[in-house]
Amino acid sequence: EKKSAEAATVLLEEFCSLHGYGKPDFGAYQSFFEAWITTPHAPEKSSNYRRDLDLSSGVATVRYELDGASHLREAFCSDPAGVAVVRLSADQPGQITFILDATSLHKGVEVTAADGELMLAGRVDNGKGNPPGMRFEGRIRVRAEGGTVAAAGKALTVKGANSVVLLIAGSTDHKLEHPDYQGGDPATINRATLDAAAKTSFDDLLAAHRRDHGALFTATTLRLDGVSREDLPTDRRLAEYKKGRADRGLETLVFDYGRYLLIASSRAGGLPANLQGLWNNTNSPPWMGDYHLNINLQMNYWPAGNTGLSECFEPLARWVKELAKPGAQTARVHYNAGGWVAHHVANVWGVTAPGPKRGVHMLEAESAAFICQNIWDHY
């Protein structure tokens, strides 16, 4: 009867609540913890500092020279091993000395150091008080060649090592399984993960990571003829490009970077890429770092099949399959209908109801069909 505005008002009042998206009980994609490496190196005394990220191998490196020694740091996140790996080395013996500690934005975390491991454990604020929310633990195991490793309060000290490998594991007790979403003990999971990784040398961990990452990254190659300013660092290339100077190599680099982000954010067995990706240094990210089903989540995965990253689609398909379970309840309660439904926003806890009362866009009941189009197109 051409009363869409009136209908929207009724729906907002009857269907939407004061809970959900943007509220403490909805949750957010939050920072885990930060590991800090404090060295005695004076920045003003170092030279030839360089850092880079190799998109094709997924390895980040830092190089610099200090007091006649060349220092190298290599870092990567291994999907096969389930750990982040950092190696600090130098071309002269006994050069690696640092303090390792950890901090978190979450309140009430417990940090301990013992037996060559640094551990940080806590529970998130669920917006409801007691009992608190999801449990989490981060654990770093230190393997040193030469030198000493010792606990010093809530930190580890490494002195005079030739090289050091840090194996980093992080887990929570969340499990993507409706209705309780309850997984195992994060400390137990981390110990098992680190024990398995510790049986493998750094070189073998790196080789396995390169094979795994490289198989995905090299599945598609984009080549554009024309000028390529590969002699310049990336920040300079971006600045020059904004001035209108052609750089076809930069355009292919951005294409490769987009694929790299999806490879890093969406691997089998994990959660799909959210509005924030993996990189987040706050407990209150934009849009809660959730899943917007009105187009954002769909856009994250549009390039997957087209650019040779079909393997990265699995987390989205599995998440949607689990979302359909609470979505069936929402369809019955809100619409007296079969099938399943979701609305504007969702999260990792199966939220499918409309709301809160923030506008008519919260009533987008077609969101389930929209995200299923991704699955239809993929399969």
Q: What feature does the model see in each segment?
A:
Residues 1-359, 366, 377-379:
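Aromatic-residue-lined binding/catalytic grooves and analogous aromatic/hydrophobic interfacial grooves
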